[in-house]
Structures are given as structure tokens and as C-alpha cells.
Regions:
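Acidic/histidine-rich catalytic cores and adjacent linkers
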Residues: 100, 107, 116, 124, ...
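A short acidic (Asp/Glu
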Residues: 305-308, 405-412, 435-439
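Short interface patches used for recognition in eukaryotic signaling and trafficking proteins
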Residues: 153-156, 185-186, 222-229, 243-248, ...
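Polybasic, low-complexity terminal segments and linkers that are predominantly intrinsically disordered
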Residues: 1-145, 624-669
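Electropositive, glycine- and tryptophan-enriched low-complexity nucleic-acid-binding patches
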Residues: 208-215, 238, 242, 312-394, ...
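Basic, low-complexity segments
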Residues: 137-219
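Structured nucleic-acid-interacting core domains from mobile-element enzymes and related host factors
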Residues: 162, 167-183, 214-215, 259-342
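Short, positively charged, Gly/Tyr-enriched micro-motifs
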Residues: 43-45, 49-59, 86-121, 194-307, ...
Length: 669
């Protein structure tokens, strides 16, 4: 019970007087005397008595009850789980009986939680991810109770052996672990990497065998699943060894066995990726009956600069938000096996070996030249096989400002397509970036050039009162918006580009709704105006993006952002921080193709090609990942999220962090 606050008794007063006398000359006593100035004699006596008695401590029962968790705007209502009174037999340490999957006392959910498969009516499928994956999250996925008692677990082998030894021998009906004076039972393990065969020998010489993994073909399932899991998260043999060591588990397969597993996984992933790209090509035929389509082509390298040994060329369809991967090409200008044998063998012996090595198609080198020439070579290869592979012709090439790849396919001999020209389209995002780069170069070019403004001589057009980084980024963004907001309308697009220059020059006639003077509150019309000498210096730069020939290539309003997003996913599965061979890079490309086009749930087909049953928990995981991908895309597509990204870009410019530096390897981990 709580103590009641009130006046002290006579006995308490006597003890308080002696204790209060000690407080008169202490530091704490001086503080009490200062507080006593605002109290009466009686109130101060009560305050001192409470101090001596000690204020009772509040408990959880004294406070108001906490409200229950009912979810938020992201999770929705949370359903309370039913508490099962009956305990599972596995909780009883003295019990030696087995668990029956049909026993109702075992608390096994009959279907996935609602968060895994959201209500299709509450999900926005207007995003790119939503349109691709809307079939992956339609309704709840129901599993049988027997299916939930499958899969793999982290099990302490000592506890497993102790439990098995309590079971009765089928021959002598005695526990397997019961020992006599002259005979004993023992356990022997035959381990094959992550799979084990446990042999229990009873004192009656009867043997009982327990396998920790079933076989898929000639290999154990766990030994095939483990490399597949490591590859999907961007780890290699060394990372697998470190993971198993920390888990106090046996080491992974030997490197040669690891390579054999990788070859089988590569073969299965290649088949699924080819089927996915074929389906994407058929969708383009369904959307457009013509065989001439518009594609977006771009290249990426395993290492920055021009010293990379591995390069990738990706080609995606341009179909609104539903852009998918149609074809890829992985190039390498080296072969690890050739490099090793060249140092070990003589010249004549190496030539003989290399001839056999090439005839067996084991050499991984498929490109001769620099890393910079990989993109044009890969682009031409992809274009030449378009008709035979997909029955399509890529007649509209959407690329960046680098014209090497486009020139390669346009001027190829013999021509890629007979009597058909390939038209160049500009990426609106790269046009926007070039605008910012030209303005930055102009500021550097005129850094020491004197100008006269308001009777004063100033140097350069940048700095305070001039063209700063924040102003360049805003002009760059307005230029991109002028192109994207007037798709298909060349005069309006050109007028919108020049309206940016006029706005900064103090002319508001052609401004859009983004201008402060057009707003309801009537903002300052000269808020973003620049000095006349600055506007005259940068006026020639606006002639480039406002040119009719360039704007005609931007009427489509498309960008290469889908290619960049696809490249980012590739290097998540094969990080740039770790060097690897071309086969490992190609495996990452194929796996990313499957996920990018059809979602994580399509990876179940890879398990089928490997003759592995994916299982209930793999299906649950992949469905949850697809659901999270759609939710994340919806969250990032809101106006608030877009505004926050714009503000972060401006902050990076103010702090001097160039946006180009964020494309370093591992920068997005």
C-alpha cells in the first residue's frame, strides 16, 4: 500500500529535529532554507517531513495504462495473436515423444501473416514496380500445416544426438544411448560439406541412420542451396567460409566443388533469365504490332575508369513505366586460366594448351581491346542478334551523350538492318545534367574575367550575388522539368526552356506556376533574379538545350534511369569492391534480370531448374520482398519524398559534395 502524506507524529518530530539540525550547516540545508523563503512555517515543516520520510516511489500500477499497438499508416491494423494454452511437446525436456504435425496443440499458423500478402485494393500499382509485380502479391498464400514443418534449421548437433539416443532401438527395444559394462552404442558422422550422415550403432549391433539433408540428384540439397544463397547476397567463397566459421559450422565446399556448384547455378539462372527476357520481348509485340521498337542501351563496368576487366551492356525496352530487360551482354578482356598457364608453361606448350582450351569453349575472354571499347562492341552484338533472338528491330536508340555506341551500330558494316536507319534519341536526364555541367564550366572559365556591375568591378560570374551552385542546380532541374512536362510538343518545350532564362533575367511573362510571382501569396518576383552581366554570359548556353534538333530527340521524354537502376542491382549481387571472374559477373546479371523483370518470386523457377523444392519459407520470403518493393516504390513516389530528395541535392551542393562522387563502389551499401 502507498504511504499517506500528512503531518508527522511526536516521535517522528523528535527525530526530524535532530536530523534537521545537521542540515542547517550543510550544502543541502542551505538549498532548503532558500526554498523555505517561498513557504510558510507549516508548509516548510511538511516539506521537510516529506524529505525525511522519503517520497514513495511510483510503480507501473500507479500510472495510466499504455494504449495497445494498433499499427500506423504504413502497417495498418495489427491483429492480436491467439495464445495457445497447451504447450508443444518439444517444450517438455523430459518428453521423448516426437511431434505430430496433425496435433492441434502445436501452434502452427495455417497461412502467411497479412503483411506478406497485402490487400490488392490498398496497394498502389501505378508505380513501375507495382505494374511488374502486381501478380505476385494478389491475395494471401495458404499453406498446409505439414508444409510448415519443412526446410532447414540451425540445430546444435550435440542436442540432436542426445535426443536421438533417447529413442528405442527397433531391434532390442532399448534406448540407443543406454550403455552396459561390456558393450556400448556410439555415433559416427559422415560429413559432406553442409550435409551429414549420422550412424547410430546400438549395443545389439543394429544401426540407425539419420540424414540432415535430402538429395537433389547426386548432391545434397543443403550443399546446393548454400552457394545459391551466398551468390544472391553478393558473397563469394571467402565470405561463405567466414560466415560458417562465426556460426561454428563446418567449412564450405572446397573451391573446386564450389566452382562445380556455381556452374550448375549459372546454367539454371541463365535458362530462367532467357525466358524472362523472351517474355519481355513478347510484351513489346503485344503492345506494338510493329517489329520496330524503341530501346534504351547503356554500359557499366566492374571498376571505375578505363582499367576494368569486366563490362556489361544492358538493353531495356522503353514502354512507359513498365520497362524491362530485353537483352544483356557481358564482356571480359581477360581469362584467369589463361593468365595462370601462361606463367607456368613455355610459349610453345602454352599455344598448344590455349588451342585446346579455346576449342572446348572454356576461355572466358570474349573481347580484345580496352574497357572503353566494351560498350560499343557489346551494343553491336546485341543489335545484330535482335531479329534472330526476339524477332524485333531496335530502330530507335535511346542513349547518353556518348555517341560511340550509336556510331558503331549506325555505321556498322555490313549494316545491322537492311534498308533501315537507326534513330538516335537523347536521354532527358543526361540533357539536364549537361546543362548543369556547361554552366559550371562557364563559371570556371570566367573566374578571373572582370565585369562592371553597379559601378563596381567584380571578377567572374560566380560567388555571392552571382551564379552559385544552388542556382545552377535549380536551373538544371527546371530545364529537365521543361522537357518532361511538354512531351511531344516541340514549340512548348522550346518556350519553356527559354522561360528559365527570362525568369532569371527578371522577365515574368513566360513563367509557369513554379515562379514565385505566379503564386497566390504574390511572392517576391526578383527573388531568383541574377545580375545582367551574368545573364548575358550564360545566354549562349541556353541555345544548346533550346535547339530544335536536340529537342526533337527529347520529345519522347524518356531517360536511362531504368538502366542505372538495373546496374545498381547487379553490383549489389556482385560488389565492385571484390574482383571476380566474368562467369560470376554474368551470374549476377542473369539473377538481377529475373528479379528486375518479374520480382523475387520468379526466382522459384531457378530452384525448379536445380531440381530443388523451394519450400514454404522461400516462397514466404520472396513474396514479402516483392511486397516491400512495391511499398517502397509508392513511398518514394510521393511529392513529399521527391521534395526531400531535391533538398538533399541542394544541401550536397552547398556543402561541396559533388553528386558524381556518390557512384563509387559500395557507396549505396
Amino acid at each position: 500500500m502507498r504511504k499517506e502524506w500528512g503531518c508527522p507524529t511526536a516521535n517522528q518530530s523528535a527525530s526530524y529535529e535532530s536530523r534537521s539540525h545537521a542540515l542547517q550547516f550543510s550544502k543541502h540545508g542551505r538549498k532548503l532554507r532558500q526554498k523555505a523563503q517561498c513557504f510558510t512555517a507549516d508548509s516548510f515543516y511538511q516539506y521537510l517531513s516529506l524529505l525525511m520520510m522519503g517520497q514513495p516511489r511510483k510503480t507501473r500500477a500507479d500510472r495510466p495504462k499504455k494504449r495497445g499497438w494498433n499499427g500506423n499508416q504504413h502497417t495498418g491494423p495489427v491483429k492480436k495473436k491467439k495464445v495457445v494454452e497447451n504447450k508443444s511437446p518439444i517444450d517438455n525436456e523430459a518428453s521423448t515423444s516426437t511431434i505430430d504435425a496433425s496435433d492441434e496443440s502445436v501452434n502452427i499458423p495455417s497461412k502467411l501473416p497479412p503483411s506478406v500478402s497485402p490487400d490488392p485494393k490498398s496497394v498502389d500499382f501505378n508505380t513501375a514496380s507495382g505494374q511488374k509485380l502486381k501478380n505476385n502479391v494478389q491475395g494471401d498464400i495458404v499453406f498446409d500445416k505439414e508444409e510448415l514443418l519443412t526446410g532447414f534449421r540451425f540445430v546444435d548437433i550435440k542436442l540432436l544426438i542426445d535426443f536421438v539416443q533417447t529413442l528405442l532401438c527397433p531391434t532390442c527395444k532399448r534406448p540407443l544411448g543406454q550403455n552396459s559394462r561390456h558393450s556400448h552404442s556410439h555415433v559416427k558422422e559422415h560429413r559432406t560439406n553442409q550435409a551429414s550422415k549420422l550412424v547410430f550403432t546400438c549395443q545389439c549391433k543394429d544401426k540407425s541412420v539419420l540424414f540432415t539433408s535430402k538429395k537433389c540428384g547426386r548432391v545434397y540439397e543443403s550443399n546446393r542451396r548454400f552457394p545459391l544463397a551466398m551468390f544472391s547476397i553478393g558473397k563469394h567463397h571467402t565470405g561463405a567460409k567466414r560466415f560458417l566459421g562465426n556460426m561454428n559450422m563446418p567449412p564450405p565446399p572446397h573451391r573446386q566443388s564450389w566452382r562445380n556448384h556455381k556452374k550448375q547455378i549459372e546454367k539454371a539462372t541463365k535458362l530462367v533469365a532467357s525466358a524472362s527476357m523472351q517474355e519481355a520481348a513478347q510484351e513489346m509485340k503485344t503492345t506494338d504490332p510493329h517489329t520496330d521498337i524503341q530501346v534504351s542501351c547503356d554500359g557499366t563496368w566492374h571498376r571505375r575508369g578505363f582499367s576494368s576487366k569486366n563490362g556489361i551492356v544492358t538493353l531495356l525496352s522503353v514502354n512507359g513505366r513498365n520497362s524491362k530487360v530485353i537483352d544483356t551482354e557481358t564482356l571480359a578482356n581477360h581469362c584467369d586460366a589463361c593468365a595462370k598457364h601462361k606463367h607456368k608453361k613455355g610459349e610453345a606448350e602454352f599455344e598448344q594448351w590455349h588451342k585446346t582450351h579455346t576449342q572446348k569453349k572454356l576461355c572466358e575472354k570474349n573481347h580484345t581491346g580496352s574497357a572503353g571499347s566494351m560498350e560499343p562492341a557489346g551494343t553491336e552484338t546485341i543489335f545484330r542478334r535482335s531479329v534472330t533472338k526476339h524477332g524485333l528491330r531496335y530502330t530507335q536508340y535511346l542513349g547518353d551523350g556518348d555517341s560511340k555506341s550509336y556510331s558503331r551500330v549506325k555505321n556498322a558494316q555490313p549494316p545491322v538492318y537492311d534498308n533501315t536507319d537507326i534513330t538516335k534519341l537523347e536521354c532527358c536526364g543526361h540533357v539536364q545534367k549537361r546543362m548543369g555541367r556547361h554552366l559550371t564550366n562557364k563559371v570556371s572559365e570566367l573566374k578571373k574575367t572582370p565585369f562592371v556591375h553597379n559601378g563596381k568591378t567584380v571578377k567572374g560570374i560566380g560567388g555571392r550575388g552571382g551564379l552559385k551552385k544552388t542556382a545552377i542546380l535549380k536551373i538544371q532541374g527546371h530545364c529537365g522539368a521543361a522537357i518532361r512536362n511538354n512531351v511531344g510538343d516541340l514549340p512548348a518545350m522550346k518556350k519553356a526552356v527559354w522561360a528559365i532564362w527570362e525568369h532569371r533575367n527578371g522577365q515574368r511573362d513566360s513563367c509557369g506556376t513554379w515562379c514565385p510571382s505566379k503564386k497566390a501569396d504574390g511572392g517576391d518576383p526578383n527573388k531568383n533574379a541574377l545580375p545582367p552581366y551574368v545573364m548575358e554570359a550564360i545566354k549562349p548556353i541556353f541555345s544548346t538545350p533550346a535547339d530544335d534538333s536536340l529537342l526533337e530527340k527529347c520529345l519522347h521524354g524518356g531517360t536511362q534511369n531504368t538502366n542505372e537502376s538495373f546496374h545498381h542491382l547487379i553490383w549489389e549481387r556482385c560488389p565492385k569492391t571484390t574482383f571476380c571472374g566474368p562467369s560470376r559477373v554474368e551470374l549476377a546479371v542473369d539473377d538481377t534480370t529475373v528479379v528486375f523483370n518479374n520480382g523475387e518470386l520468379r526466382r522459384l523457377s531457378i530452384f525448379q531448374e536445380l531440381n530443388i523444392e523451394a519450400g514454404v519459407y522461400a516462397t514466404q520470403c520472396f513474396t514479402a520482398l516483392d511486397s516491400a518493393r512495391i511499398s517502397r516504390a509508392c513511398a518514394l513516389g510521393t511529392q513529399q519524398a521527391k521534395r526531400q530528395r531535391q533538398l538533399r541535392t541542394l544541401d550536397n551542393a552547398v556543402l561541396g559534395r559533388d553528386t558524381e562522387e556518390f557512384y563509387l563502389s559500395g557507396a549505396h551499401e
